[in-house]
């Protein structure tokens, strides 16, 4: 009796492999914002005790959201530099934005370098893995996707249902900060609400992007943009304040070692 050979499994061709690779790359690029929120949250929930004792895991938790904010803020800064201005008076607000964007980027880089070096408590793990990603990533995402800082128009650019999504995300970010400060039991709900809203917004950006051409400069669009910018200043300013103590302690340690030489 002749035993039939199993059917050969065809391997993907080079072109098919390239298409798969490009598709995965596109998915990662389009959905990087929700992924950069989700991964630190999962690490904080599943590896809390390990994170407290592992410098590498603490570094990864800081790297994921803050590398995104550092890069996006720098790209916005570069785009502003490449814009043309009609007058020196018109150039002034863009100069202010450039200073803020560079400050946001520098604060993000310092956060990656400094925060992992400190000792983390259980509260610190929750703060760094859940709170900061849900504050930093959505605000940076809205600044880069939903706001215009160039071409003579400073405004919020969303249209249609994207307006409701980003307004909900902005409110969720504000409430997340408030509930963290008052140590509310509802804090985790806003963490996951923020993640879901960013995921929905990323899906909309990929499949149904807003049409931002020739938008009127209306008061409400400027107000929403101002709210995003002010909340960003508050968040990054608070992070910069938290960085002062470890920087000061590190400087004192360096001075003591120099004196002992």
Curated annotation (Swiss-Prot):
Q: Could you name the domain of life of the organism this protein comes from?
A: Eukaryota
Q: Which family does it belong to?
A: Belongs to the UPF0328 family.
Protein name stated in the entry: UPF0328 protein ECU06_0100
Q: Which organism is it from?
A: Encephalitozoon cuniculi (strain GB-M1) (Microsporidian parasite)
